[in-house]
Curated annotation (Swiss-Prot):
Membrane-spanning intervals of the chain: none
Gene: tmcAL
Record-given protein name: tRNA(Met) cytidine acetate ligase
Reaction(s) catalysed (UniProt annotation): cytidine(34) in elongator tRNA(Met) + acetate + ATP = N(4)-acetylcytidine(34) in elongator tRNA(Met) + AMP + diphosphate
Alphabetized SUPFAM superfamilies for the sequence: Nucleotidylyl transferase (SSF52374)
Protein family: Belongs to the TmcAL family.
Length: 393
């Protein structure tokens, strides 16, 4: 955050944040409302939600949804982390793919026919068409997402400029603490769910406000969220489904339904299920997203109705600082998408999916807390934060 503000000299900072489930196909550690508080306390001025129909998708769709929201908010500059760290290389790579599109698509198909996952096939295709000196390494996850941000900016004819900050010390998938002050999200999540875990081990790797809110959430609700807590619901659902039922679920294709129904029979945990399910063709993240859609019963028809090839249909405002509120007041007449301060009365196919996802997310809570949280989510107004006093209003 500090580096972003230093690099962009921004007047205000806006964060587009996933809701209950994340792009890598797993539940968020804590609710979006607690994460909104974390963002505001760390210097963000506006927090808006990326709908489930975009947030639990491959990088291209995820980026397209996020950029469309930022465009609607008239953002002038975007900043993202990457393994490469040179923004020119991202533009070079997008240009190279466009110029070699026919060759690129042929190579992707060729590598997929050889049994590779789409992500691996794409990475190999890029290696064949790109010069390594002026282009990014498309095998790295943050580079992939950054590439899609630039592609979305250009495809949406946006005037938005882009900057990138190089990741260092810790890589995306690192599961151990390799540095005294920097750790990957994967590593932090693993630590939080390890045996005899405590917040002490991660305090030096995350902002003080984040650590405090994580501890508060666990104290108030008795849990942090991960896939294992949903496994019994997930397994029960699969036990009641036929291959035909599964084929209607989004991202279930090419015979995957039979493999899923076979492997769930002998799996006693989500991790063991994933270990049994994964193949060279399907990445762990790709499979986790498919499992998320099974858990939330998100069908191909629902995603089709959500029209994810277009821009996000609304802006769900989750939180704002005083400065953020001023920005919205000054620019609200220019913002063409509806801004939702709650979802109780708004109706849209994308929001139907969102409501299901929220319901599933809170399903691990005990009653009556579960019902209270779900009802509160629909009527919850944006969190307000006074940055001068560092207090929530």
């Amino acid at each position: 955050m500090q580096q972003t503000k230093k690099l962009t000299h921004s007047d205000i900072t806006i964060a587009v944040m996933s809701g209950p489930f994340l792009q890598r196909g797993e539940p968020a550690l804590v609710s979006k409302w607690y994460r909104t508080k974390m963002a505001l306390a760390c210097g963000v001025d506006l927090v808006v939600e990326l709908p489930y129909a975009f947030s639990t998708q491959k990088a291209e769709t995820f980026a397209n949804g996020a950029i469309s929201i930022l465009n609607a908010l008239h953002v002038s500059e975007i900043c993202f982390g990457s393994e490469d760290g040179q923004i020119e290389n991202f533009y070079n790579t997008v240009s190279a793919q466009k110029n070699e599109e026919e060759t690129f698509n042929r190579l992707v198909k060729q590598f997929m026919n050889a049994g590779n996952s789409y992500a691996k096939a794409t990475s190999e295709a890029f290696l064949h068409i790109l010069s390594s000196e002026k282009n990014i390494d498309m095998s790295q996850p943050n580079n992939i997402l950054g590439f899609q941000y630039i592609k979305a900016i250009l495809m949406q004819n946006s005037s938005m400029q882009a900057q990138t900050i190089k990741r260092f010390a810790s890589h995306y998938h690192d599961e151990t603490f390799n540095d005294q002050h920097i750790a990957s999200a994967t590593c932090i999540r693993k630590q939080l769910f390890s045996e005899n875990s405590s917040f002490t081990e991660i305090e030096s790797f995350i902002p003080k406000a984040t650590a405090s809110l994580l501890a508060s959430y666990k104290q108030n609700y008795g849990t942090l969220h991960n896939w294992e807590q949903y496994f019994s619901f997930f397994k029960y659902k699969l036990m009641t489904m036929s291959p035909e039922d599964l084929r209607h679920i989004y991202e279930i294709e090419e015979g995957l339904e039979h493999r899923i129904l076979s492997k769930i029979q002998t799996s006693s945990s989500f991790h063991l299920f994933m270990e049994a399910l994964k193949t060279k063709r399907y990445t762990w993240t790709r499979l986790q997203r498919a499992c998320t859609h099974i858990l939330t019963n998100t069908t191909k028809e629902e995603i089709h109705c959500a029209n994810i090839e277009q821009h996000a249909p609304y802006i769900r405002l989750l939180g704002m600082s005083q400065k953020g509120q001023t920005y919205l007041s000054k620019n609200k007449k220019k913002i063409e998408l509806p801004i939702l301060t709650h979802t109780k009365t708004f109706d849209h196919p994308t929001l139907h999916i969102e409501r299901k996802a929220n319901s599933v997310y809170f399903s691990i809570m005990k009653e009556p807390l579960r019902t209270q949280l779900l009802k509160r989510d629909a009527t919850h107004h944006p969190i307000r934060y006074d940055e001068t006093t560092a207090k929530f209003l």
